[in-house]
């Protein structure tokens, strides 16, 4: 039902636990995310209100997900996530915490940073494009065009001396979101479009390209 392009989705079996962090533009995001890599030990956090959805809920239950009660601190889901990571699983989540109706990045919540701080696992950014177009595709009797780009794994930046915890979490969260923003078109970067860290990452990419071509 879609034309799908997937880039750099090879997650080595030797990678023992990692967070997959992605932008969130569609209910289908978690399905595409979990099926885009060949690794079988992949699970994702998903809002518990989808559990009762007849069609979509059935798919999610079959895939296997961690149900998250959105809008409150779901410590059970956080503990379950940490347990999977400690067992070496790959866990997907959307740092924004909810679907962006505009398709553009919205300000993220600190959950992804707190999990990464607790577990120390690497983080793999993923950019999703086109997953929100199912309704449009059905109306026009055509396939969806979906692009999924995986970035390089990275670790949270180190906390600086005398840096307040709240400031550090915000800086680490910006790092995660800017690494996602690099993987999606400019018009989807939304809240993070003008972030200095994003500009720095884009400059690094251009510099690497120039070095390769010379």
Name every feature range the model reports, one short phrase each:
Residues 2, 40-42, 63, 89, ...:
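A structural micro-motif
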Residues 76-214:
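Non-catalytic C-terminal accessory region of glycerolipid acyltransferases
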């Amino acid at each position: 039902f879609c034309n799908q392009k997937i880039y750099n989705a090879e997650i080595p079996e030797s990678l023992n636990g990692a967070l997959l962090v992605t932008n969130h533009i569609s209910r289908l995001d978690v399905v595409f995310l979990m099926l885009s890599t060949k690794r079988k030990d992949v699970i994702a956090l998903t809002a518990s209100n989808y559990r009762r959805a007849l069609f979509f809920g059935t798919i999610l239950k079959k895939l296997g997900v961690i149900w998250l009660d959105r809008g409150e601190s779901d410590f059970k889901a956080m503990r379950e996530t940490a347990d999977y990571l400690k067992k070496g699983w790959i866990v997907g989540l959307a740092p924004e915490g909810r679907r962006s109706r505009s398709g553009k990045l919205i300000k993220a919540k600190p959950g992804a940073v707190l999990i990464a701080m607790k577990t120390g696992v690497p983080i793999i950014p993923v950019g999703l494009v086109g997953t929100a177009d199912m309704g449009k595709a059905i109306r026009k009797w055509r396939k969806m065009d979906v692009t999924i780009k995986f970035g390089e794994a990275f670790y949270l930046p180190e906390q600086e001396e005398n840096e307040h915890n709240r400031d550090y979490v915000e800086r680490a969260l910006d790092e995660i979101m800017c690494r996602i923003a690099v993987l999606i078109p400019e018009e989807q970067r939304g809240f993070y479009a003008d972030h200095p860290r994003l500009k720095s990452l884009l400059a690094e990419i251009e510099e690497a390209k120039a070095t390769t071509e010379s």
